[in-house]
Amino acid sequence: MTYIRVSTMTPLAGREEETSQVNQELVDFYRTQEGCVSNHFVKAADNSGEQGRISFWSSERAANEAATQERSLQLRSRLHLLVRRGHQDRSFTVAAATTDAAVGSAV
């Protein structure tokens, strides 16, 4: 079962570039971890300045193991000093009824 993590945040004023760099370092690190299917650094399409990461894992266990690695903990600690309150970390699983064919199809 695919396990998905979504992290969103808004950098503090003047810390946008550093926040982007730390997020990219996390993405690069997670891509090397066992069970990582796909990992992406994202920025909001509007002018909100929000950014984050979306990662797909082979299992919740794989995601948790990567998140508790020393490098991940260090980088995530740095992020907390760079972003506004309200940083969100969410986890999802792919719904059983979801199929690849349904993605992007017209409703």
Mark where each language-model region is.
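Short, charged/polar surface micro-motifs in flexible loops or helix N-caps
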Residues: 13, 47-48, 58-63
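Glycine-rich beta-strand-turn "strand-cap" elements at beta-sheet edges
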Residues: 1-4, 9-10, 38-49, 75-107
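An amphipathic, aromatic/His-enriched active-site/gating alpha helix that lines ligand/cofactor pockets
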Residues: 25-37, 56-91
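Short, surface-exposed ligand-recognition loops at beta-strand->loop->(often short) alpha-helix junctions
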Residues: 10-21
